[in-house]
Amino acid sequence: MADYTNPIPAGNAPGTSAVVRNTDYGREYYGEQAFWKMQTGFLDALFGFTRQENLVLITVLKNIHPRTNTYDGTIKGLARRADVDEKTVRSALLKMQEKNILAPVAPGQWMLNPRLLAKGSFLQEVKLMATYDTCQGKKVHGATVIDDKTGELVTLPNEYATVEQFYEAQAAERFVKLYRDFFSAISGLSETELKILVYILQAMDLGKNMYIGTLEKIKVHCGCSTATVSRAMTQFVNRNLMVKEFDGCWRIN
């Protein structure tokens, strides 16, 4: 995690600022086993995409540049990558913007909301948050800190009006590790299948990576038939998302 030195020596920056030591997580984030820092709002954002639109969403997520949280590519190129038509790409991108998953940066470039998924140190994450807010046309006027790694004067997102709020948020940071294989595992799932999967993930025991509950319980919550739930669970097992330990007990991968 990042650590901090406060205050800055006189004359180096405004007195309301602090020097922030930007400690990178290194290979843990950027190596072959890199994981995303996921907030639970990401799972809710997966709802509402058709099977074809889901392919577009997953293609974007799998090709995000982690240091900038951006996807670069044309509509035509994204359609080719996702193996869908351009109309589907436009529809999916519009939904992603409406759901606050993406914000347009420039023609052919979109930014992934770092409040849903991000990599790197806490300071790097909040820098991305400020950039994302700017992409949405918001005026960023949070506290100011200095990144001691780059010497950059950083204006924080508006939720950090004081340096103390920034410290407190860093100390209380919580997230779920999300590995890249998850994107491939959910690629092409239907809207109903995603709804079932998200319910299971949100209801599981995080300490044991286990969901306990009957198919009937899932059916009632998700508003579908028992047969639909059963088919979805088979899909999840085949995609290596979970295994069945015994009736009503599923171990999440």
Language model segments and positions:
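Short recognition helix of helix-turn-helix/winged-helix DNA-binding domains
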Residues: 1-73, 128-138, 143-209, 216
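Winged helix-turn-helix DNA-binding recognition segment
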Residues: 47-52, 63-119, 191-192, 203-253
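DNA/chromatin major-groove-contacting recognition/catalytic segments
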Residues: 121-128
